[in-house]
Regions:
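Helix-rich, typically C-terminal accessory recognition domains appended to large enzymatic cores
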Residues: 1, 12-24, 85-267, 279, ...
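Short regulatory "switch" loops immediately downstream of catalytic or recognition motifs
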Residues: 35-42, 133-137
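Conserved phosphate-binding loops in nucleotide/dinucleotide-binding enzymes
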Residues: 37-92, 106-117, 246-249, 263, ...
Length: 318
């Protein structure tokens, strides 16, 4: 509101151009933060936290379970949360990450103190992964370089795909919660890597820290000081990671497998296969995939069809 007023004032005063009256391209209306609310099943009065037995969850005065719901925070409903207490206990970055991850920005956010432990664990896990990489790092080689027929590792492909999705979430869809979820999935993949000291892991950690910076700036600054190529640079001066289209060609394209009309799991091929293989070659690739072979077993296949557009594999044995 004040930014729009200031922009219009400066425009009318001739400081800004005549077309500069609106400082924002789009208004993102945020959802309400709802607090856990307890209501007495006897008096229907809103209960204070100390009026409820923390062990059993029943109202101390009546011994009966209260009616619990999520409502707009207010003093009269005794369902408010002091953000400063959360910051003191978990840190500002953890609080910010929790708010962005808990729900889409335009949906109501149901506040639960216990749920903040999830983002807190994520940051601790990332910090531990950085420390483990530094301890195990050897001379190594450069991260996967896409030259000729060299195939990037699955971790490298996931890293570039994550960079693409997070960039889209911040610039187009504003799906901040899914962006944080993608970062968590990338960290899980990093922690599952067989060689934690490899150059691939280092490149993925560096990308993850830079993608995390808008969500957790203080943590990312400290993490970049430990893992960045030039430790003197701030994470916000390191540049935004861009997804390499040559790497993205190797990401998995899922296909659903239907056996005699019933879903039986799925398989996948790379985007490169989708682009380069004709229908016959693509069918051969999917037919020989381990997931397909497992589904078919010893059955006698009468028909095997691949629908490239719908990404469905139809197998008829009866």
């Amino acid at each position: 509101l004040y930014a729009r007023f200031t922009a219009k004032f400066l425009r009318d005063d001739g400081v800004l151009p005549a077309k500069a009256g609106e400082p924002f391209k789009r208004l993102l209306a945020q959802g309400l933060v709802l607090g856990r609310t307890a209501k007495s099943s006897v008096s229907c009065a809103y209960l204070k936290p100390h009026e409820i037995d923390s062990a059993t969850g029943v109202e101390i005065a009546t011994g009966k379970a209260p009616a619990v719901s999520f409502e707009k925070m207010s003093k009269s409903k005794h369902n408010g949360t002091d953000p400063q207490q959360v910051v003191d206990e978990h840190g500002a970055d953890t609080l910010r990450l929790f708010i962005l991850f808990k729900a889409p920005y335009d949906d109501a956010l149901m506040w639960e103190d216990k749920a903040i432990s999830g983002p807190a664990r994520f940051l601790r896990k990332l910090w531990a992964a950085i420390g483990e990489h530094i301890d195990k790092r050897g001379d190594g080689s450069d991260p996967d370089v896409i030259n000729g027929d060299v195939t990037p590792s699955s971790l490298t492909v996931l890293t570039h795909a994550t960079a693409e999705r997070v960039t889209s979430a911040l610039s187009t869809s504003f799906a901040f919660n899914t962006a944080v979820s993608d970062l968590m999935k990338l960290l899980n993949a990093i922690c599952d890597a067989p060689d934690r000291g490899s150059a691939d892991v280092r490149a993925s950690l560096q990308t993850l820290v830079r993608l995390l910076a808008p969500f957790a700036p203080h943590f990312s600054a400290e993490a970049w000081a430990a893992i960045g190529d030039d430790r003197r640079d701030d994470v916000f001066e390191a540049g935004w990671p861009a997804a390499d289209e040559r790497v993205l060609r190797y990401r998995a394209v899922p296909f659903v497998i239907q056996l005699d009309g019933r879903g039986k799991g799925g398989t996948s091929v790379t985007q490169k296969d989708m682009d380069e293989l004709d229908d016959e070659a693509l069918e051969k690739r999917i037919r020989e995939a381990g997931e397909t072979v497992k589904v078919v077993g010893k059955r006698n296949v009468k028909a095997f069809r691949v629908n490239r557009e719908k990404r469905v594999v139809s197998i008829i044995t009866k």
